[in-house]
Swiss-Prot record:
Catalyzes a salvage reaction resulting in the formation of AMP, that is energically less costly than de novo synthesis. Belongs to the purine/pyrimidine phosphoribosyltransferase family. Homodimer. It comes from Bordetella petrii (strain ATCC BAA-461 / DSM 12804 / CCUG 43448). The keyword Transferase applies. It comes from the Bacteria. Keywords: Cytoplasm, Glycosyltransferase, Purine salvage, Transferase. It catalyses: AMP + diphosphate = 5-phospho-alpha-D-ribose 1-diphosphate + adenine. This is Adenine phosphoribosyltransferase. The keyword Zinc does not apply. GO terms for biological process: adenine salvage; AMP salvage; purine ribonucleoside salvage. CDD domains: PRTases_typeI.
Length: 182
């Protein structure tokens, strides 16, 4: 069942060559979001995985992690907290910086977004180099959360992010993966 589901989801994701720059193949989830059946299948896959786990919150990484994470939080009857790009939150924040291949960036959360000991599922659409996901994990942990698992629709294992997340001891669940030849 999981293999058929993953293949359905994988077939719905659009690959856009040379975007945002030459040599990059962008994995576009908007066709998946536009198709109500496939979107429901994706959400159900996550719901069935997490419905029996003891979770307090779902955290979603800016921006596509908000889409999946908020729907998943609703379906699991949990709260949702955003992990935002720097400068997007209006209240007191705490930030975690990370390195990109072309510079640095930061993610932020409100200082009161999680309480010590809360069990959090972290969600994003894709894991590539792992910078954003690792920064979000560190940020949640600094705020006192227990990151039960990180989850993404897509893994690009050749870029090393999933291995870096695994090295932190945080479990990672992904639905499908792509290599550079695809």
């Amino acid at each position: 069942m999981q293999t058929d589901t993953a293949e359905l989801i994988r077939r719905t994701i659009r690959s856009v060559p040379d975007w945002p720059r030459p040599g990059v193949v962008f994995r576009d989830i908007t066709p998946l979001l536009q198709d109500p059946r496939t979107f429901r299948v994706l959400i159900d896959l996550f719901v069935y995985r997490y419905m029996r786990q003891r979770l307090d919150l779902v955290a979603g990484v800016d921006a596509r992690g908000f889409i999946i994470g908020s729907v998943l939080a609703y379906e699991l009857n949990l709260g949702f907290v955003p992990v935002r790009k720097q400068g997007k939150l209006p209240y007191r924040t705490v930030a975690e910086s990370y390195t990109l291949e072309y510079g640095n960036s930061s993610v932020e959360m409100h200082t009161d977004s999680v309480r010590t000991g809360q069990r959090v599922l972290l969600v994003d659409d894709l894991i590539a180099t792992g910078g954003t996901m690792l920064a979000a994990i560190k940020l949640l942990q600094r705020l006192g959360a227990n990151v039960v698992e990180a989850a993404a629709i897509i893994d690009l294992p050749e870029l090393g992010g999933s291995g870096k997340v695994a090295a932190t001891g945080t479990p990672l669940f992904t639905v499908c993966s792509y290599d550079s030849a695809e």
